[in-house]
UniProtKB/Swiss-Prot annotation:
One of its GO terms (molecular function) is hydrolase activity. It comes from Nicotiana tabacum (Common tobacco). One of its GO terms (cellular component) is cytosol. This is Actin-103. It is an enzyme of class 3 (hydrolase). There are at least 7 different actin genes in tobacco.
Length: 336
């Protein structure tokens, strides 16, 4: 969250709400009935953590309202009655959801004006383009969204319920093979950090596995909060490989490369060339080193041989949805 015209968000915190597991345990802490974001994260040992956004779509409005309240009051510290608000939504978000969002903004927060933009479209704007296909992969959901001259093509948008949370779960699972047990919601956050620090995408998965077996070149150490140091090797690239091979976690779905290709094939034949040449990665789950090269290699193998393929991975892509929103909301034409 932040202000239009800024080049980076002022507030970045996880969309989690924590409710105390036992009431009245924390003596003298002036116990709240709910904690949001980083505070929920740091007190996670005594809380039950919940994600009000599932697969990119809000499923728990009470908790979502708490997150918005926290954003206005504690993070941005602005009077919400005085500021127009730009919110974003997942592609193919149900209409009822958008209406509920609008209702809460006007009735609970009394905002003067609001607009709801599609996340992937904002990412494309942030990359300086108006035509291209965006692969947006966050924590709960991934989407491929073809956009032509500023407009998303809804018939060709594809959704993949595979994203950051599943990669963290996968890493938790494969760490147990090494005898490292991570199970609680608190421990999951440790594994998420490990994933963000150490995971990468292999250009050739099988070859990388052979390398990992025969040498220790891919091994890295990771220090846990209690000081214990663990070593991970092949787990580093096995974790995000699921994005390309969902069958590894028992999902019957096409990988992100094939989903992107399928999305392009649902578009008019005349615009495919523009899409192949402007494949833009966006979202936290596209931050793995090596992902753009792998994506390029896989799509080149699927596309017609003469086709020029370009995969763009902007360095700020973790926040490119926000940056696109900042650009859009600061245009004078938009404010009218």
């Amino acid at each position: 969250a932040g202000f239009a015209g800024d080049d980076a968000p002022r507030a970045v915190f996880p969309s989690i709400v924590g409710h105390p597991r036992h009431t009245g345990v924390m003596v003298g802490m002036g116990q709240k009935d709910a904690y949001v974001g980083d505070e929920a994260q740091s007190k996670r040992g005594i809380l039950t953590l919940k994600y009000p956004i599932e697969h990119g779509i809000v499923s728990n409005w009470d908790d979502m309202e708490k997150i918005w309240h926290h954003t206005f009051y504690n993070e941005l510290r602005v009077a919400h009655e005085e500021h127009p608000v730009l919110l974003t939504e997942a592609p193919l978000n149900p209409k009822a959801n958008r209406e509920k969002m609008t209702q809460i903004m006007f009735e609970t927060f009394n905002v003067p004006a609001m607009y709801v933009a599609i996340q992937a479209v904002l990412s494309l704007y942030a990359s300086g383009r108006t035509t291209g296909i965006v692969l947006d992969s966050g924590d709960g959901v991934s989407h491929t969204v073809p956009i032509y001259e500023g407009y998303a093509l809804p018939h060709a948008i594809l959704r993949l319920d595979l994203a950051g949370r599943d990669l963290t779960d996968n890493l938790m699972k494969i760490l147990t093979e090494r005898g490292y047990m991570f199970t609680t919601t608190a421990e999951r956050e440790i594994v998420r950090d490990m994933k963000e620090e150490l995971a990468y995408v292999a250009l050739d998965y099988e070859q990388e596995l052979d390398t990992a077996k025969s040498s220790s070149s891919v091994e890295k150490n990771y220090e846990l909060p209690d000081g214990q140091v663990i070593t991970i090797g092949a787990e580093r690239f096995r974790c995000p490989e699921v994005l390309f091979q969902p069958s590894m976690i028992g999902m019957e779905a096409a990988g992100i490369h094939e989903t992107t290709y399928n999305s392009i094939m649902k578009c008019d034949v005349d615009i495919r060339k523009d899409l192949y040449g402007n494949i833009v990665l966006s979202g936290g789950s596209t931050m793995f080193p090596g992902i753009a090269d792998r994506m390029s290699k896989e799509i080149t193998a699927l596309a017609p041989s003469s086709m020029k393929i370009k995969v763009v991975a902007p360095p700020e892509r973790k926040y490119s949805v926000w940056i696109g929103g900042s650009i859009l909301a600061s245009l004078s034409t938009f404010q009218q």
